[in-house]
Amino acid sequence: MRHFLTLNDFSKDEIEQMINLARKIKKEAKTREFKPYLKDQKLAMIFEKSSTRTRVSFDVGMHELGGYALFLSKNDIQIGRGEPIRDTARVISRMCDMAMLRVDKHETLEEFAKFSSVPVINGLSDKFHPVQLMADYLTMLEFSAGEKVAYVGDGNNMTHSWLMLASKLGLELRVATPKGYEVDAGILKMANENAKISGAKIFITNDIKEAVNGADVVTTDTWVSMGQEAEKEKRLKDFAGYCVDENLMSLAKKDAIFLHCLPAYRGYEVSEAVFERHADEIFSEAENRLHAQKGVMVWLDERRR
C-alpha cells in the first residue's frame, strides 16, 4: 500500500504512470464515459483548511469514478476537540477506502498515514501541495510547454512541491524569492540529491529577471497564504517588485505559459493583464486538479491489491 504525501516518495516512472492514467481518464470523461474504477469506494475528506478547488475536485472526481466522498471539517469530527490523530486515522480507515487531508501541519498528515490502513492523500499541508503539481504538470503537457520553469514568489509549499517535481522528472527550475522567504534548506537538499540522478537543473535566486529569462513556464502563488493574515502588511511590502506583469513575462519565451494554483490576487503576485492573457492556461490547470487526482486515486487503489 502506498500513500501520496509528497512527490519525493515516488520515482519518475511512477509519477508518469499517474499522469498517463489521468490523461486516459480525462479523455474518457470528455466523451462522458465514466468508468467505475473506484466503484462503491468511500473517500474521507478531512479539512482543517477551507478550499474551493480541493473540495470540489475530489468530491466530483470520486463520484465520476463510481465512489463517493464524505466531507469532514475539523469541527465535524473529534480532531477538533482533541482526539489523537492516530485514533481518528484508525477509525476512519476501518470505515472508508481512502482518505484525503488538507491540513495546517505536514506532521498531522504523516501521523495520520502512519496509523491508517488505507491510502492517504495530501490535499495540502504547510510543506507540500503535491496534487496541485500533478495538475500543473498535466497542464504543461497539454499546452506543449518546454521544461524550463520559473517560480516567482514565496518559498512555500508550492515552491517545495515544484522542487520535488522538477528534481524527479529532470526539469530545469529557477526559483526567485525575496530575501528572508527562501525555500526550506532541507527540502532544497533533497531536490539537489534527486537532481544528481535525474539531471534536473535547480537554480535559486532573489533576482526575478534572472529566473524568468528564457522560461517556458512562469508560475507564482499568493503572497499571503491562509494563516498568514497577521503578516499581510509586512509581506506586501517585502514582496513589492515580485509581481508577474507584462514586462516580466516579456523576458520569458514568446510562447511561454503562465500558471497559478489560485486563488489569485490581481495587482499583487500577478497583473490583471497577464492573468487574463493566460486565463485559458490557468483555468485548464484548475480543471486538471479533477483529472490529475483521479489518476492518483486510481493508481493508489491499484497498488493495494
UniProtKB/Swiss-Prot annotation:
InterPro entries linked: Asp/Orn_carbamoyltranf_P-bd, Asp/Orn_carbamoylTrfase, Asp/Orn_carbamoylTrfase_sf, Asp_carbamoyltransf_Asp/Orn-bd, Orn/put_carbamltrans, OTCase_ArgI
Example of a GO biological process term: arginine biosynthetic process via ornithine
EC number from the UniProt entry: 2.1.3.3
Subcellular location: Cytoplasm
Residues annotated to bind L-ornithine: 157, 221, 225-226
Reaction(s) catalysed by this chain's protein: carbamoyl phosphate + L-ornithine = L-citrulline + phosphate + H(+)
SUPFAM superfamilies: Aspartate/ornithine carbamoyltransferase (SSF53671)
Record HAMAP family: OTCase
Family recorded in the similarity comment: Belongs to the aspartate/ornithine carbamoyltransferase superfamily. OTCase family.
Protein's name in the database: Ornithine carbamoyltransferase
Source organism phylogeny: Bacteria, Pseudomonadati, Campylobacterota, Epsilonproteobacteria, Campylobacterales
Encoding gene, per UniProt annotation: arcB
